């Protein structure tokens, strides 16, 4: 008779062979493909919420305050595009750190440019 190791090996190989056969059957069998689509459609799509800024949790509330407050938009192109929108209060709070960050990035670019030529 066959040893238990041989039997386990044959079982493992047959299971792997079945998995390979099932993977290839979706192309040939439209029913298997439909079953896979049904399984995927059961999961509801995830809703993405914007991050809360300064305690604003709902976008509906944000629209009212934005009408009264002016926004500042900063855009510049370097080797990459950067765009930032800030309200007046956010600019007052983070303006100095943002300025230092941009200055560091831009001065790095200027210092590296002559070395490349």
Swiss-Prot record:
Protein localization: Secreted
Superkingdom as given in the UniProt entry: Eukaryota
Propeptide: 52-75, 99-117
Modified residues (Leucine amide): 98
Chain spans, region Disordered: 28-69
Cross-referenced InterPro entries: Motilin_assoc, Motilin_ghrelin, Preproghrelin
Tissue specificity: Mainly expressed in the gastrointestinal tract with higher levels in the stomach, medium levels in the duodenum, jejunum, ileum and colon. Low expression in the testis and brain. Not detected in the salivary gland, pancreas, liver and lung.
Annotated signal peptide: 1-23
Keyword Secreted in record: yes
PANTHER family: APPETITE-REGULATING HORMONE (PTHR14122:SF1), GHRELIN PRECURSOR (PTHR14122)
Similarity field: Belongs to the motilin family.
Protein name: Appetite-regulating hormone
Naturally occurring in which organism (per UniProt): Mus musculus
Gene label: Ghrl
